């Protein structure tokens, strides 16, 4: 401690659970813990939802896109019921009330070009997908595809799309007194004699030692640095990079859909997001974004223009604005850097009271919270403290979506 530090301004504060990371996973967990009676708080060093959460397309899907190889995978089976689960929350009948969250679309489409139509038809005739998809034709087609030039097949999925900033706002609003902005330049972990960790927070002349029965890391890519600071021996994190493409235009039709290609990953995934100036952004993911991770921005934009001109040649994007966004999907390490099938949470090695957690996809944030509550229960960690600790820290802002930042649409 510096010689001029006034020890009279030092104090210990207690809470049951401290969550580090204010994305969807951390905010969802905060709700679940408070509902279970825990005195929980959340610390975020940036804006709530920043990085991976707001970079998401907002899809709540039931895994159909993971079955495009023709097989039911662990990923597909793990999340088959998630659209229904989230839908109950949006209706106010689930474990968290999300009635104020903006729903961008209550369905998602899967469409094919003429060259892949037979594959799509054969697959969706199987029992594996029965009740989860419906074929649409004629006037049932989305307006974007109601043109003579379109000759592919279209299926309507039970998946839905949420406005992620709206979701973050809805989750954060009821619990603002428990959400704090932390500056890791003036805060650090302390290893206690019993092997547990506390967090020392310096604010002005005040020093607080925040003691918690458990610390839960839900900081996405930031978990790696936090685990390093803690001296944790496990788990190890992997990242799988993407480079998404954003197209700002004034074409009238909103669209949410996957285009089936020759690979297991959709050729391109399109979600639509309104801008304040009346235009909209098509946010492009799928194989285009996965392959785009190794490309420069200009090269990827050229590929995206070619893809859209092949798939939707009747859409005039000649006056559109284009941009790209690099995204790192943070996950627990898998063999051959494969995509994880399920949410992950476990106690960190060499840390008595630290859990490392990754939802691995937006859809599974509720599953992650359930896993963490079970870990706490199994270890016998029960609610002990009544009210949130007094921390002289401000409440973080809500992160802006990437199209607002990239196109100046704030």
Regions found by a protein language model. Give the residues of each.
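Active-site substrate-recognition segment that forms the wall
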Residues: 217-352
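Glycine-rich FAD pyrophosphate-binding loop
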Residues: 34-55
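Helix-loop-beta segment of a Rossmann-like dinucleotide-binding subdomain
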Residues: 101, 138-181, 209, 287-288, ...
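C-terminal catalytic lobe of FAD-dependent flavoproteins
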Residues: 158, 166, 312-408
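Dinucleotide-binding Rossmann-like beta1-alpha1 core, especially the glycine-rich loop
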Residues: 58-143
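Glycine-rich Rossmann-fold phosphate-binding loop(s) that bind the pyrophosphate
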Residues: 21-23, 45
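Helical element adjacent to the flavin cofactor pocket in flavoenzyme catalytic cores
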Residues: 154-214, 218, 222, 366-373
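Extreme N-terminal leader/targeting segments of oxidoreductases
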Residues: 1-17, 35
């Amino acid at each position: 401690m510096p010689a001029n530090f006034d020890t009279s301004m030092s104090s210990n504060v207690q809470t049951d659970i401290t969550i580090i990371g204010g994305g969807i996973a951390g905010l969802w967990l905060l709700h679940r813990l408070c509902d279970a009676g825990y005195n929980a708080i959340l610390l975020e060093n940036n804006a709530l939802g920043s990085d991976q959460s707001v970079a998401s397309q907002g899809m709540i899907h039931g895994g159909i896109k993971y079955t495009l190889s023709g097989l039911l995978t662990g990923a597909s089976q793990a999340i088959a019921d998630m659209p229904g689960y989230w839908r109950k929350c949006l209706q106010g009948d689930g474990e968290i009330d999300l009635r104020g969250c903006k729903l961008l679309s209550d369905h998602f489409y899967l469409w094919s070009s003429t060259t892949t139509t037979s594959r799509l038809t054969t697959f969706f005739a199987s029992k594996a997908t029965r009740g989860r998809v419906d074929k649409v034709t004629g006037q049932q087609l989305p307006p974007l595809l109601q043109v003579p030039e379109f000759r592919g097949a279209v299926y309507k999925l039970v998946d839905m799309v949420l406005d992620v900033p709206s979701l973050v706002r809805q989750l954060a609003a009821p619990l603002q007194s428990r959400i704090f902005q932390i500056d890791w330049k003036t805060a650090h972990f302390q290893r206690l004699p019993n092997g547990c960790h506390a967090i020392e927070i310096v604010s002005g002349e005040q020093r607080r030692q925040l003691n918690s029965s458990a610390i839960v890391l839900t900081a996405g890519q930031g978990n790696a640095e936090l685990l390093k600071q803690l001296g944790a021996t496990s788990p190890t994190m992997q990242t799988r990079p993407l480079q998404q493409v954003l197209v700002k235009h004034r074409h009238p039709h909103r669209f949410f859909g996957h285009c089936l290609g020759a690979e297991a990953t959709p050729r391109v995934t399109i979600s639509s997001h309104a801008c304040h100036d009346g235009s909209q952004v098509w946010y492009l993911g799928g194989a285009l974004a996965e392959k785009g991770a190794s490309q420069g921005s200009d090269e990827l934009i050229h590929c995206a223009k070619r893809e859209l001109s092949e798939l939707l040649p009747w859409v005039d994007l000649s006056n559109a604005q284009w941009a790209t966004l690099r995204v790192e999907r943070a996950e627990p390490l898998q063999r051959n850097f494969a995509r994880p099938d399920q949410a992950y949470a476990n106690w960190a090695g060499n840390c008595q009271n630290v859990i490392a957690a990754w939802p691995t996809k937006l859809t599974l944030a509720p599953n992650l919270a359930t896993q963490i509550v079970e870990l706490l229960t199994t270890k016998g960690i029960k609610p002990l403290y009544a009210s949130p600790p007094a921390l002289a820290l401000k409440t973080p802002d809500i992160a802006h979506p990437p199209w607002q930042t990239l196109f100046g649409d704030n």
